[in-house]
Amino acid sequence: MTKSNYSANNITVLKGLEAVRKRPGMYIGSTGPDGLHHLVYEVVDNCIDEAMAGFCDKILVVLEPNDIVRVEDNGRGIPVDIHPTEKISALELVLTRLHAGGKFDKGSYKVSGGLHGVGVSVVNALSVWMEAKVYKDGFEHYAKFEKGSILEPVKKIGETEKSGTVIRWAVDPSIFTETTVYNFEVLATRLRELAFLNSKISITMRDERLSTPKEVTFAFEGGISQFVSYLNESKQVFPKSPVFIEGEKNDILCEVAIQYNDGYNENLLSFVNDINTREGGTHLEGFKTALTRVMNDFLKKYPKLVKKMDKEEKLTGEDVRAGLTAIVSVKVPEPQFEGQTKTKLGNSDVRGIVDSFVNEKLTLFFEQNPNEVEKVLEKCVAEAAARIAARRAKEATRRKSGLDSFGLPGKLADCSLKDPESCEVYIVEGDSAGGSAKKGRDSKTQAILPLWGKMLNVEKTRLDKVVNNEKLQPIIATLGTGIGKDFNIEKLRYHKVIIMADADVDGSHIRTLLLTFFFRYMPQVIEKGHVYLAMPPLYKISHNKKEWYVYNDDERDSVLDQIGRGNNAAVQRYKGLGEMDGTQLWETTMDPARRKMMRVTLPDAVEADRIFSTLMGEEVEPRRKFIEENAVYANLDV
């Protein structure tokens, strides 16, 4: 691996650490589960910085008992010598001062994903204690900290041939009051992503909290090409292997991997220095522009396909990205982030660099693989035809109704209040359950939309079919946001969208189909926390004129034990919502003071995309494998 003289001279100090414990949310976003896991990412980001600089190829993350985390790498080791101006050990400086780190010295790090020094010092400030071991220059060094302050100054504790850094800590439960328990799968998802983005490293994660420790290693020599294959694993794809494009100009490294599948949804991920740029930015704009241009240029070479297009009609960006899985990853020395969550790249020069590389390399690939380009163009042209058909249908509806969109559906029992924040809509399967819900609701704030007809699996369907589906059309009209590129979250008519289906296998299937629709066509409704699942009771238990509604088998057994097994309690299992009258439905499922609901969240869009594709796609084997591996976590009818 690369060698470099990395010492205290490379550490630059910007300001102190005082405010972190007082206002932790300013530094890690929240003190809930997201913030807790963010601490691990901050420490791992330092290891990744070492890897991107060429000094580290192995990272270990260990979850120990008692909510302790240990992160190790085999990099150069954080400097331990005395800083020339601060007159303390560089290790102490990095871990106790905000904005102290090698990232700010261009000689030490060309590009940086995490905030080297910033991240670790914040973790230190929010921990009850932290230990640091550094293997460097033939010696093992040790220091201990308490709530961000030095407790045991840096000292040599032995000789070693190793190099690297070990950071071990226990978070402060007085700050993380919601939970201090780490979720293995949440961490594994991010570590897997980092391993895909950095093909020369391996990341091992071990859970020592279990009686039999669980260990998984992520190492992907294929890098982002392998990432695309992973995302497409349950789909029929072309070309067989993803197209990989890379290039470097003005110290900006660009990598792109693309592959089409037989679906209709685009899955476009972009990263800057390993940071997921969820809001996109100039690198993504450059990619999209080049892709659309290349496709239109090649279309001219296929007259039979041109004939299928309307005159003067060109392929749009939406046409060429339907069924596309692509990853755009750039490494930028000084990224400028914009947007609401600072996850949008603003560097204008990156747009042209990505555009140029994609245009040149994709053109070359298509020239060398004419069969592949014809397959792709056939798909793009079919998508254009569907888009034009959907547009004409929408225009016809508009002329006919005099409305900008579909009118509100006839079966919708709307609420009287018009303030979206106070209103909720129950999407209910079947007219009988819809009737009970209408009778039991609070008509001031609760709207009821009964669904009828065949539910569509949007994972296998084009936009024009989705827009015209008899079951989805009323949902689109009721929510008021529009879908696809017309979507506007500000027009959402209800801030709680509650899916209410039977507590059986058919109900689970309907819930999954509806969630797939929201994820594919209205993802912001989920991201903003507006989608909920109603939790109707599974059993009603009656005894001595008393009634209990219970929601699972464990609760049923607990109530029966409480009554006494020999006391002839009557147990009714609800097969469907229609078996309850309006009063029962209100008391058990709709009364805000008593009901149980589950909010649908989207902590990781990448993994959610893969799971929806696996569960709702055409391929049977990946679905079977997923269900077998995850049966312990869900009640599935296999």
Swiss-Prot record:
HAMAP family, A to Z: GyrB
Named cofactor requirement(s): Mg(2+); Mn(2+); Ca(2+)
Details of cofactor binding: Binds two Mg(2+) per subunit. The magnesium ions form salt bridges with both the protein and the DNA. Can also accept other divalent metal cations, such as Mn(2+) or Ca(2+).
SS bonds (residue pairs): none
Listed CDD domains: HATPase_GyrB-like, TopoII_Trans_DNA_gyrase, TOPRIM_TopoIIA_GyrB
Any one GO molecular function term: ATP binding
Described function: A type II topoisomerase that negatively supercoils closed circular double-stranded (ds) DNA in an ATP-dependent manner to modulate DNA topology and maintain chromosomes in an underwound state. Negative supercoiling favors strand separation, and DNA replication, transcription, recombination and repair, all of which involve strand separation. Also able to catalyze the interconversion of other topological isomers of dsDNA rings, including catenanes and knotted rings. Type II topoisomerases break and join 2 DNA strands simultaneously in an ATP-dependent manner.
Main EC class the enzyme belongs to: isomerase
Record's subunit section: Heterotetramer, composed of two GyrA and two GyrB chains. In the heterotetramer, GyrA contains the active site tyrosine that forms a transient covalent intermediate with DNA, while GyrB binds cofactors and catalyzes ATP hydrolysis.
Organism: Treponema denticola (strain ATCC 35405 / DSM 14222 / CIP 103919 / JCM 8153 / KCTC 15104)
Electron transport is among the record's keywords: no
Keywords, in A-Z order: Antibiotic resistance, ATP-binding, Cytoplasm, DNA-binding, Isomerase, Magnesium, Metal-binding, Nucleotide-binding, Topoisomerase
Catalytic activity: ATP-dependent breakage, passage and rejoining of double-stranded DNA
Annotated site, Interaction with DNA, chain positions: K454, N457
Sites where the protein binds Mg(2+) 2: D502, D504
Family label: Belongs to the type II topoisomerase GyrB family.
CC annotations in GO: chromosome; cytoplasm
Other remarks on this protein: Few gyrases are as efficient as E.coli at forming negative supercoils. Not all organisms have 2 type II topoisomerases; in organisms with a single type II topoisomerase this enzyme also has to decatenate newly replicated chromosomes.
Protein name as it appears in the record: DNA gyrase subunit B
Locations listed in the record: Cytoplasm
Catalytic activity, EC: 5.6.2.2
Principal subcellular localization: cytoplasm
Chain sites annotated for binding Mg(2+) 1: E429, D502
Domain Toprim: 423-537
BP-aspect Gene Ontology terms: DNA topological change; DNA-templated DNA replication; response to antibiotic
Keyword S-adenosyl-L-methionine listed: no
